[in-house]
């Protein structure tokens, strides 16, 4: 995976270390983090990415709300699958919670190749 803060290169990392790298993103940066995994491209707000990584590293799990349902990541594969399955560009901070602004399944989840 290749990580950029906006257009500034940050790191190349194994998927299993994604949370560690996202936790180290500069707190002053408020823009979008771009993550490339092969041909896949994921975008996520830097504030949301840091909070998601912080929760995962601190509590050994993190959760997001998508259409009122909680998606919980309890291991590294689950954490990475949040990026692979959910439109992360729709995630926002709502108080202390991370929530998707999607209103339908089509706008909440990415199409996964069969």
Curated annotation (Swiss-Prot):
It is an enzyme of class 3 (hydrolase). GO terms for molecular function: DNA-(apurinic or apyrimidinic site) endonuclease activity; endonuclease activity. Its EC number is 3.1.-.-. Transmembrane segments: none annotated. Keywords: Bacterial host gene expression shutoff by virus, Degradation of host chromosome by virus, Endonuclease, Host gene expression shutoff by virus, Host-virus interaction, Hydrolase, Nuclease. The keyword Nuclease applies. Disulfide bonds: none annotated. It comes from the Viruses. GO terms for biological process: degradation of host chromosome by virus; symbiont-mediated suppression of host gene expression. Performs endonucleolytic cleavage at abasic sites, which are generated by the base-excision activity of host Ung. The cleavage generates a 5'-deoxyribose phosphate and 3'-hydroxyl end. The sites are specifically recognized through the formation of a complex with host Ung. The viral endonucleolytic activity damages the host DNA, blocks host DNA replication and induces cell division arrest. This may provide an advantage for the phage and save nucleotides for the viral replication since it specifically targets the host DNA, which possesses more misincorporated uracils than the viral genome. Interacts with host Ung; this interaction allows the viral AP endonuclease to localize to newly formed AP sites and cleave them, leading to inhibition of bacterial growth. Belongs to the apurinic/apyrimidinic endonuclease family. This is DNA-(apurinic or apyrimidinic site) endonuclease.
